[in-house]
Amino acid sequence: MSATSLPGSQQPDLGEIRHDWSVAEIRAIHDLPLMDLVFRAAQVHRRHNDPADIQRASLLSIKTGGCPEDCAYCPQSAHHKGAGVARERLMPVETVLAEAAAAKAAGAQRFCMGAAWRQPKDGPEFDAVLAMVRGVRGLGMEACVTLGMLTPSQAGRLAEAGLTSYNHNLDTGPDFYEDIISTRTYDERLQTLANVREAGIGVCCGGIVGMGEGVTDRAAMLQVLANHAPHPESVPINALVAVPGTPLEDQPAVDPFDLVRMCATARIVMPRSRVRLSAGRKSLTREAQVLCFLAGANSIFYGERLLTTANNGQDDDAALLADLGIRVGEPVRAAAE
């Protein structure tokens, strides 16, 4: 018997804010019949969020390529020279702020900046990133950066600059992680998240579907996120973009229903987080995207590029959201609870 067909007294409260999920519980939710899962996720979403509010975030690679990490999915890794991504220096502050202003004019509320570093070094480049953050905030936009690992001091300086959120994805569950990355441990990722939280910055943290992981690995990743208190401010759900020249270049395309299931499950276990339908969305039909929105996804990356891969066109996204009667999202909460 599915969860939606249980008598009322036996219905689990899937909209409760919890931090004690087991992998088995999350796996059971994920594996519900798809229509039951989407129905329950939509109920939770409407209980905690405005379903007509979908945030648009713009993403810019401010320093591209040459990363010393060996993440198997990433064309920016110096280990994957066959991916053909040229190494570029950190962009000038003025160039980044011009891109942010253009993104705002196109309808984005959040501007995300990514640098291909293992960890930023204190000095002129980190100072430039701080200036970028201050400039983006001065435009009236939310600012998010992903720079690799952070020390507590660096997190504190980013907080002082006004950073809204820091992205540091877990990528997958702890048991599958070492199949994908050997140069940074899971615990190091968790420590960076702790440093970000301690500084009072919102946490943006999610993962990637389609790297060869099992469903239990996906549930385990969501468990780690959902058992953090508070929940992440935003949770990016990515479908692998299999880039030629990377170790995962031959991975099969992700089934769109797998993304729907991940969005729905993330919504149920983290009711108030922004669930961001992220990389790989370009491969989805309009109808598949709508299913993800119905299941609780309430943020997208807006703009024709995501770091080094293609994204949906702005005009196509604007037309889809208009057809759905969805307005541009308001600024997100500083924390998910």
UniProtKB/Swiss-Prot annotation:
Keyword 4Fe-4S: yes
Pathway the protein contributes to: Cofactor biosynthesis; biotin biosynthesis; biotin from 7,8-diaminononanoate: step 2/2
Cofactor: [4Fe-4S] cluster; [2Fe-2S] cluster
Stored Gene3D superfamilies: Aldolase class I (3.20.20.70)
Record-linked SMART domains: BATS (SM00876), Elp3 (SM00729)
Reaction(s) catalysed by this chain's protein: (4R,5S)-dethiobiotin + (sulfur carrier)-SH + 2 reduced [2Fe-2S]-[ferredoxin] + 2 S-adenosyl-L-methionine = (sulfur carrier)-H + biotin + 2 5'-deoxyadenosine + 2 L-methionine + 2 oxidized [2Fe-2S]-[ferredoxin]
E.C. no: 2.8.1.6
Binding site for [2Fe-2S] cluster: 112, 144, 204, 276
Keyword Protein transport: no
Domain of life: Bacteria
Binding site for [4Fe-4S] cluster: 67, 71, 74
One GO MF term attached to the UniProt entry: iron ion binding
Record-linked InterPro entries: Aldolase_TIM, BATS_dom, Biotin_synth/BioAB, Biotin_synthase, Elp3/MiaA/NifB-like_rSAM, rSAM
Cofactor note: Binds 1 [4Fe-4S] cluster. The cluster is coordinated with 3 cysteines and an exchangeable S-adenosyl-L-methionine.
Domain (Radical SAM core) ranges: 52-281
One record GO biological process: biotin biosynthetic process
Pfam families, alphabetized: BATS, Radical_SAM
Key words of the record: 2Fe-2S, 4Fe-4S, Biotin biosynthesis, Iron, Iron-sulfur, Metal-binding, S-adenosyl-L-methionine, Transferase
UniProt subunit comment: Homodimer.
Described purpose of this protein according to its UniProt entry: Catalyzes the conversion of dethiobiotin (DTB) to biotin by the insertion of a sulfur atom into dethiobiotin via a radical-based mechanism.
Matching HAMAP family: BioB (MF_01694)
Family per record: Belongs to the radical SAM superfamily. Biotin synthase family.
This protein's name: Biotin synthase
Name of the coding gene: bioB
